[in-house]
A protein has these predicted regions:
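A beta-strand edge to alpha-helix "cap/lid" segment located at domain peripheries
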Residues: 1-28, 33-122
Length: 122
């Protein structure tokens, strides 16, 4: 399996684990240095991000993937993914967003990990 295929599968797995609130997998696929930059500009480190998923501050219901692009350079990669994401976040109502995420990833010991993400709409 190519790195590009592994990373694309990791992206899809990430959404599945967000919907299922699977803390163990979320912890495994995000590097300890991970930071999510929300559309508002808020920076959320890994522990806070996963905690918000688990406590319902970030509620994800479904994700329909519309496409992604992966560029690998050695042991780092960039993934840009577009998905229609149904969620209720930060106390707002349930809504479907056209969410674009740009991820930085690193590879260590043969596995890929998300290190940084920036959210926007498309």
């Amino acid at each position: 399996m190519t790195d590009e295929v592994q990373i694309t599968q990791l992206y899809q797995e990430m959404y599945t684990t967000m919907v299922n609130k699977d803390r163990a997998v979320l912890e495994r696929i995000h590097d300890d240095s991970f930071v999510l930059v929300h559309m508002t500009g808020m920076h959320q480190p890994k522990a806070s991000y996963i905690g918000a998923i688990m406590n319902g501050t970030l509620n994800y219901y479904a994700a329909e993937h519309e496409g992604s692009h992966v560029a690998v350079r050695g042991d780092t990669a960039i993934l840009s993914g577009r998905s229609r994401v149904t969620a209720a976040v930060f106390g707002g109502g349930k809504h479907t967003w056209r969410l674009q995420l740009r991820f930085d990833l690193k590879q260590k010991d043969g596995a890929w990990y998300f290190t940084h993400a920036e959210a926007s709409t498309y």
